[in-house]
């Protein structure tokens, strides 16, 4: 069975939480796009883990994890991440982690270039809100054919690879010197860096497409793990305030390495309220007062897992979520962090937008989203700790009414509701996987 777990909104919906649960019965968990520019948080009996590159399934020793062809991989960051979780007793070796030979390497200059450009824009008051992880530059060079793939590390002594390195470095030094007045990098230093990475990661690099296809054909349970959410998709998100990859479920088999396989299920993950990291239109943050937003931010611990930046927050946005559901084509929905709302007497929900006093019929990522005004409906809250609830019937009637209101607005049943960060704190409503 092939299942994709995707974000419906701007990311940070709690996908890692859901994937960790599904990994209990999975054979393989594979990342299919993005890099280390976002983090999945998983809480286990060993404590809290923040994973930027490693799939959330790495915390299950019987699961094989894959970094797929659609990713851009900062190998220095991956090395540090592996060291960090191994120090906490998590096994990582070529048996349970496989890296696609077709994945793009995030080269040393990509983060440098990202930071320099963000600083240049900031001086003009036009900062983009980049994570400075070099993601856009790695993807840009991928499509310009001006970078290496992981498989090239296995052939560094071949003339064709060394010639490509010369061509790539010549082009990059021209860019960095001409645009940012940086000193050129040497070929010898670059080749040495590549050899160092090959020395560590060569045993992990393989044709993951063949591995995944064999697993799929033999009936293994495969979970494909997305990064970020629909609003950050390069094609269907709020352009240009997007990531540089395709975050949608339709891309999952392709980015993982099995373009000839069809998804059986798509799990769309929603948070019980709205959050966003980075620049761009985000109507939800204008629905309530900044004091209300700050209280929600503190209650939910809403700070970026990869960057530590305070997340922009607001009420649940039904308009944006309907669009995200359409993009992802989800047949299962997981709602996370319902417990964060437990202290509120009333809970706001965004049920519409207006623009210049006229109701906006639907969410359009290319329209004047920075000018829309949210229409808010207030629902009764519940003054009860729900973290101990183990079934739908145990939830307060107001909490159940809140979830059912969202279902009606979205036109889709919600099957999974998390009531706390820990693995066991969730309730099921309807048929789950």
Residue ranges and their predicted role:
Residues 1-433:
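Non-transmembrane, aqueous-exposed alpha-helical and coiled segments at domain scale
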């Amino acid at each position: 069975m092939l299942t994709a777990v995707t974000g419906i909104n701007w990311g940070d919906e709690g996908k890692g939480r859901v994937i960790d649960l599904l990994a209990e019965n999975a054979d393989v968990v594979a990342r299919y796009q993005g890099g280390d520019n976002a983090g999945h948080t998983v809480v286990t009996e060993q404590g809290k883990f923040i994973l930027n590159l490693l799939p959330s399934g790495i915390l299950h020793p019987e699961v094989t994890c894959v970094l797929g062809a659609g990713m851009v991989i900062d190998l220095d960051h991956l090395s540090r991440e592996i060291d960090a979780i191994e120090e906490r007793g998590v096994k990582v070796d070529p048996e349970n982690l496989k890296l696609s030979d077709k994945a793009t390497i995030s080269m040393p200059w990509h983060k440098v270039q990202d930071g320099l450009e963000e600083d240049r824009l900031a001086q003009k008051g036009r900062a983009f809100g980049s994570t400075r992880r070099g993601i856009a530059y790695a993807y840009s060079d991928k499509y310009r054919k001006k970078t290496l793939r992981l498989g090239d590390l296995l052939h560094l002594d071949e003339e064709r690879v060394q010639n490509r390195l010369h061509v790539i470095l010549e082009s990059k030094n021209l860019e960095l010197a001409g645009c940012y007045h940086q000193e050129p990098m040497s070929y010898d230093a670059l080749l040495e860096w590549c050899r160092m990475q090959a020395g560590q990661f060569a045993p992990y690099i393989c044709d993951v497409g063949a591995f995944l296809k064999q697993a799929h054909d033999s009936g293994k349970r495969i979970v494909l793990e997305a990064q970020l959410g629909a609003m950050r998709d390069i094609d269907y998100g709020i352009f240009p305030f997007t990531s540089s990859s395709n975050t949608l479920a339709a891309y999952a088999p392709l980015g993982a390495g099995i373009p000839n396989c069809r998804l059986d299920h798509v799990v769309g993950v929603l948070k019980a309220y709205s959050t966003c990291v980075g620049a761009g239109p985000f109507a939800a943050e204008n629905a309530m007062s900044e004091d209300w937003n700050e209280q929600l931010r503190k209650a939910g611990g809403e700070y970026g897992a990869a960057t530590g930046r305070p997340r922009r927050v607001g009420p649940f946005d039904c308009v944006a979520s309907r669009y995200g559901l359409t993009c992802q084509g989800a047949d299962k929905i997981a709602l996370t962090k319902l417990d964060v709302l437990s202290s509120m007497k009333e809970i706001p929900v965004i049920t519409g937008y207006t623009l210049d006093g006229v109701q906006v019929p639907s969410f359009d990522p290319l329209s004047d989203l920075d000018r829309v005004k949210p229409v808010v409906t207030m629902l009764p809250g519940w003054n009860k700790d729900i973290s101990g609830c183990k079934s739908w019937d145990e939830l307060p009637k107001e909490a159940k009414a809140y979830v059912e209101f969202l279902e009606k607005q979205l036109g889709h049943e919600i099957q999974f509701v998390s009531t706390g960060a820990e693995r066991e704190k969730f309730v099921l409503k309807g048929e789950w996987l």
